[in-house]
Each structure stands twice: as structure tokens, then as C-alpha cells.
Amino acid sequence: MSDIDRGLFERVLPARIRGSYAAKFNVLLLVVVIIVAAAGGYIHLQTQSTVGENTERRVSGIAEQQAATLHDWLTQKESTTTFLASNIGGDAVRTSDVKPQLERQLATLQQDVRAIHVVSTSQDTVVASTDDARSGTTLQAGDAPWLSTIEDGTTDVSVSDPYEVDDSPVVAMTAPTDKPGWVLVMTMSLAQHSQSFNSPIATGDVKVVNGDGVITLDNRNRALLEQYTDTAGNVPAAVATARSGQTVYNTEPERTGMDDGRYATAYTPVAGTDWVLTYHVPRGQAYALQSEVTQNLAGLVVVALVGLLLVGLTVGRRTSSALDELAGVAAAIADGDLDTTIPDTDRTDELGQLVGAFGEMQTYLTTAASQADALADQNFDADVLDEDLPGAFGASLSQMHTRLEALITDLDEAREDAEQTRKDAEEARAASERLNERLERRAAEYSDEMAAAAAGDLTRRLDEDVDSEPMQDIAEAFNDMMGDVEATLAQVRSIADAVDAASTDVSTSAAEIRSASDQVSESVQDISADADQQRDRLGTVGDEVTSLSATVEEIAASADDVAETVNQAATESERGQELGEDAVAELERIEATADSAVERVTALEEAVDAIGDVTGVITDIAEQTNMLALNANIEAARADKSGDGFAVVADEVKDLADEVKESATEIETLVDDVQADVADTVADMSELGDRVDAGSETIEAALAALDDIGDQVEAANGSVQSISDATDEQAASTEEVVTMIDEVTDLSDRTATESQQVSAAAEEQAASVSEVAGRADDLDDQVSTLNDLLDQFDARAASADTDEN
């Protein structure tokens, strides 16, 4: 599998990790842990930011709401002050009537209104007051800080700085009445009003700081009229910033009158005044939601990590161990160890199915290997061959089994036919030997008779009652010749002694030629039964030569026919040799075909080895598929929250499924190749049978050619007979007879060479032929002498004729 075919996760891993499912599983768990932790951190940061913004908006909103409420309260009090001042009459008002009026009005006001005074600015005295202790008193600047706020001729309501009255912090509002020189003063309890702040957050702390940095209002009444400072004793800069019209939000330490700790604080201005309202909420309370979300998120992350750890220790570890065992089994099978033990499992999931598939594959391969071994050993009765192998591969093995059985049956039949042919040839050779023995005996008798005739006993005759027509023809011709010889004995008496001496030498040579011919006949018995007749004809030629007579010239003419016939016999012998070479070539081609069959079987074995490699690929893909299937289950459980992760894993599973499909295609192609190799092997075996048949036909053709050689030898025998009948022409052709004898000698040599392939007697025949050649030379000398004598005889005959004429 190339890098292109692997997933991104597989390509980025080092080779050491890719080779181990456990390592990849642990890396994946680590990646998931990192992703979960990163997601938790991101959610935490997002929550912190969101909660921080919400907290800021909430705290600032509460501060602004409280400031608006305070502004409404001040506006209401100013309106009340103006209303009360307007109810004080003009110049006709009596002092005694003012106090009751003020008391009636105080009774209608809120409880935070402490007292109402009417002050004469010209006399700095209290004209009337709801506080009896104040009525008719002269005001001092220390007792009435609001005096500084009264300005003659102003119609506006003024608000004094906070101060204490009887240890109670108050603030006063002044407004001029309709009576000139009189001013209405209404004092309000800051402690009473501070309690009116309604904080939505129970732990919220509301403080109002005036322009001097003094705490004017405090909902907890713990620091009224104290300086509002930070831990360093300084007024926070945020107060001045808020006084300029901005709402400021900070997380800062405690301020005056607050418990230690950090607070979420909002500073906001109070409209129409130089006051600043501050709202403090303990940070833990303000960010309680953030803390809760963080805790819940941390708990979720911990649960997820623990779950992943448990999955890794249980499912992942068990799966890794099982896959390691399967990988070992697959490696053993790929190495040819089909007896390796596949671990048992009671799992019914994909891993259990994979283990079962390995078992089935092991059984399949074991059966296929056993059947292949049985076929290789030609053990066609093996029980394993009866087992059914599914698929094209099993069908190919079955077909090969059938064809091999048929081929071996054909080979056995061909072997039996060849054995029968050999037996027939041996019987034919035996019959030929028996015939040859009879002919040899008859030839010996003829030789004795001819030798006697050659010695001068012209009364000898040959027995014409023989079972061989050529021998019968020879006997008849000899008897006729001897009659002619007796008739002409008187004419050739003058040269009878010389002819007798020459005939004796020729007879001796002829005997030697006959002996050599006998050896040649014995050497070529495996070639043809009729080869023996050739030896007989050559013996006859020797005998006929001893019977030289007046017909020598006719013998020379017939010698041409003998040479031609013997040449034809030599040609047929050469043709037999060529056919023998063709038979050898056919056997070589048969051997080449067998080599090709061996190569096909070797290719079949290599294809079986390639099936082990594909099994390794299927093992790797199974490991990855199992791991990604586990991840898919984990992601599926979280699909309601993280559907994208499940989609990624699903894509990985799909990619691996495609890879499995490609590997399956590769296996199918490989099996097709194996089937093709098996088909080629069967074809080669068929071709081997054809070659054997062709070899048999070639051998039969060689035997037929050898039969033709026998026929040609018979023709040569006929020519020799013609030589016997035409001895009167021998005188004119003596030199040609010598030449023909040399050619016959050469032909005998070639016949001996061919006979060496059949029998060890070829060397003896060659030696005999050489001896015959030597004897032929001696005969040539004698014939030369005879020619001289005959020339003299012819001359004498011609002279006699002349005299007679």
C-alpha cells in the first residue's frame, strides 16, 4: 500500500509506530486526550470570556440602575424641598404658624427625611423647625454646613455636603421660600436611605462617593462619611474617570468598609451631582457561573480521559493482543507454515469474524497444498483430491488433476505400444535370423559346389529345390552356366590353368567377402530383416566371379545396374539415418516441452507465495479497520456534541474499506494468473503427448525406410544374377567391374557406419570390408592377367576365323 492510499493520520506517523497497532492506538488515544484537553481549555477560555463580559454587563448595569434610582431619589427630594418652600407664605406669614405646617408636612414624607427647618438668612437663626431643639437657635457654621450653600436671590435647590447630627450622618437640601430672607432646609438621614438600596446580588456592596471622596451612602452603613480609598490609602482613579461621565469596570481588591478579597467593581456617575456610585460584588460570587462551568467542564474532561483510559486498557489492549496474535499467524502462513495454530476466540464481532476467516483460509490453503503435492507425486488416489475447493483456483486444480490422469494413461498406453512394437521387431529379427541361417547353410553348400567347380570339377551342379527364389535363380543360372562352360571347355582349354589359378584366388577372396558380409548382416539385423539378403547377394557376387566364363563382358554391363541399385540402397540408408535424427530432434523438443511444464509449475508456486503477501496486506488493513471502527464507536457516542469528529473517523473507515476492495481485486487477479499458469501447464503436457506420438511415427518411418533398403538389396541381387548371365561381356568391362567393386566397398563402409548406431558389430564389418577391398585389389591383378590371356584368346579366335575364311 503506497503513501497515497493511506490516510493522513497514517502518513504522518513514523514507520515504527505504523508497524504497531498498540502504538497507533496509544497515539490515537493521546491525540484524543490532547483534543479533549484543548477543547476543554478552549471552552474554558470562551466561558471565561463570555461570563466575564456578562458579569461586567451585569455589575455595570446594576450600578447604573442604582445610580439612576439615586438620581430619581435626589430629584424627588429636590422637588419636595421646592414644594415645601413654596408653601411657606409671604410677608404676612406668622412664625407661630410655620412650625405646625412643617410638622404636618414631615408626617407625609418618607422616613429618610430627618427634619425640616425654616432659617432666616439675615439673622442666621432657625425660625421654625420640626426638631424642637433647633427652633429659635442661632446657627453656627459647624452645626450647619449647608449655610455655605445658601445664596441670596437663588431659586435653585442646593445640596450640602454630608455631615453628622447627633452622630447620625445626614445631608441637607435648601430652597428659598416666598418670604424674603427665609430658606427651607430639609435634612435627610444617609443611613436610612442607604438601607433602601436593593442589590440584586445579595453580597453586593453599594457605596456613593461625593466630590471630596467621602462615602455619602453605604448600603451596609459600615463606612458612612469615611474617605473612599484603596489599600494604599488613595482615592481610586476610577472615581475621577466615572465622575467625568463614564462607567468603569474593574476587578480589584477591597475598598474602605469592605471585607478582604477581590471584587468585581463598577463605577458610574450620578446624574446632576458630582457623586459616583460604586457597586462591589465579591469576585467568587460574580464569577460563580464561570467557576461552576469550569468545574463541570473539568469534571467532563476527567470523565472523558478516564473513559479513554479504560477503553485503552480494556478494548484497545485486548484488540491489540488479538491482532498481534493474528499478525503472527498471518506471517507464519505467508512463510508457508500452514500448520500454525490459530487462537480460539468466542468473539462475534469483526475481530472474531476475522479470526474465523483466517481459519477458513488456513484450511483452504492446506487443502490446496495437499492436492498440489498429491498431483506432483502422481498420487491420484489420495483422499485429499476428493475434497472440494471452492472458487476458480479449486476448479483449476481439479481440471489439472483430470488432465494429468489422462496424460499419464496415454503415456502408459504409448509405452505399452512401444513395448509391443519392440517385441514384434524382436520376433521379426528372430525370424530373419532363422531365415538367414538356412540361407547361410544353402550358401555354404553352393559355395562348396562352386568351389569344386572352380577347382575343375565341372560336373558339379547346384540344388535348385530351395525356399528362396533368388537362391533358386542363382542355382539355375549356375547350372546353365556350367553347361555352357562344359560346352566351351574345348575352346578355353589353353587358358584353363591360368583361369583355374585365378579362380582359386578369387574364390578365397570371395569367401572372405562372404564372411565379412555375414558380419555385416548380423550388425544390421536391428535395422531390417532384409539386410541379410544383401550379404547373401554379395556372397553370390563372389561365387559368380569364380565362375568367370565367356560372358565376362555381359557381367560388366550388369555391374552398372548393381552399382545403381546399391547406390539406391545407400540413399535409403541415409534417409533412414535422417529419420533417426528427426526422431532425436523430436525427443529434444519433448524435453523442451517438459522444461516448459516445469517452469509453469514454478510460476504456480510463486503465485501461491504472492497469495501470502496479499494476506499480509489484508492483515494490515484489518488492523487499521478495527482501530478506526473502535474510534467510530467512541465518536458515535459523542455524536450529539461532536458530530464532526465522527464524520472524520467515518471517512477514514471508508478509505480503508476502499483499500480492502483493492486488495481483494489484487487477490482475484493473482488467482487468474495462477489459473492461466495451470492452463499453460496442461497445454504443455498435451503437447508432450503429441511429441511422443510424433516420435513414434518418426520411428515407424525409419523402420519403413530400412524395409526399402532391404528391397533395394534384393534389386541388387537381381543385378548380380544379370551379371552371372552376362559373363561373356566381362572382358570388355573388366576395369569397370573393378570400379563397381570399389563402389560396393564404399557402400558397405557407409552401411557399416549406419549399423554402428544399432549394433557393436559395425567395426568388424568395416574391417571386413577393408579386407574385401584388399582382396579386390588382388582380384584386379588377377583379372588384369586374365584380360591379357583373354585378349590373347580373342586374338587367337579372330586369327582362326580369318584362316577359315
Curated annotation (Swiss-Prot):
A Pfam family: MCPsignal
Please give the knockout or disruption phenotype noted for this protein.
Mutants completely lose the chemotactic response towards leucine, isoleucine, valine, methionine and cysteine, but they still respond to arginine.
Show the ranges annotated as biased composition (Polar residues): 516-526
Where it mainly occurs, coarsely classed, is membrane
Q: Does the keyword Cell inner membrane apply?
A: no
Query: Locate the Methyl-accepting transducer domain: which residues?
Result: 509-745
Q: Describe its PTM? A: Methylated by CheR.
Q: Which GO terms describe its cellular component?
A: plasma membrane
Q: Which SMART domains match?
A: HAMP, MA
The protein's GO terms of the molecular function aspect are: transmembrane signaling receptor activity
According to its UniProt entry, one GO biological process term is: signal transduction
Cite the residue spans of the region called Disordered.
513-532, 752-779
Compositional bias, Low complexity, is annotated for 754-773
Spans traversing the lipid bilayer: 25-45, 296-316
Q: Report the domain of life of the source organism.
A: Archaea
Keyword tags = Cell membrane, Chemotaxis, Membrane, Methylation, Repeat, Transducer, Transmembrane, Transmembrane helix
**Cellular localization per UniProt:** Cell membrane
Membrane topology per the entry is:
Multi-pass membrane protein
Its family remark reads: Belongs to the methyl-accepting chemotaxis (MCP) protein family.
Q: What does this protein do?
A: Mediates chemotaxis towards five attractant amino acids (leucine, isoleucine, valine, methionine and cysteine). Probably transduces the signal from the substrate-binding protein BasB to the histidine kinase CheA.
What name goes with this protein? Transducer protein BasT
Q: Which organism is it from?
A: Halobacterium salinarum (strain ATCC 29341 / DSM 671 / R1)
UniProt gene name: basT
